């Protein structure tokens, strides 16, 4: 599966647009890590537990988006975008979406 944030893929022609595909997940951290993160905000710097949380959530969202595209018979997903939002305290949703397409090499 070819993934692109652009609308076109160099060296390929889009021969069919199959539709919008998306993947999302909501993740939360363990209460103990949340308390440790609160203390980290006092000192400043990266809060690694939240960085790991969002990285893991983004990867899951991408895999779910790819699975939707594969069900449609897509070769690629173009125009990929990401969104995130706080669902509740210590829980974040990550959304990945794009357009599933069939492509051929030029």
Swiss-Prot record:
Signal peptide: none annotated. Pfam families: YbjQ_1. It comes from the Bacteria. Belongs to the UPF0145 family. This is UPF0145 protein Tlet_1264. It comes from Pseudothermotoga lettingae (strain ATCC BAA-301 / DSM 14385 / NBRC 107922 / TMO) (Thermotoga lettingae).
């Amino acid at each position: 599966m070819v993934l692109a944030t652009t609308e076109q893929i160099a060296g390929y022609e889009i021969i069919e647009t199959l539709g919008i595909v998306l993947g999302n997940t909501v993740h939360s951290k363990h209460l103990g890590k949340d308390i440790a993160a609160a203390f980290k905000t006092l000192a400043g710097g990266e809060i690694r537990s939240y960085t790991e949380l969002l990285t893991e959530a983004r990867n899951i969202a991408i895999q779910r988006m790819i699975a939707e595209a594969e069900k449609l018979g897509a070769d690629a997903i173009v125009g990929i975008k990401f969104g995130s939002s706080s669902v509740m305290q210590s829980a974040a949703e990550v959304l990945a979406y794009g357009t599933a397409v069939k492509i051929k090499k030029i």
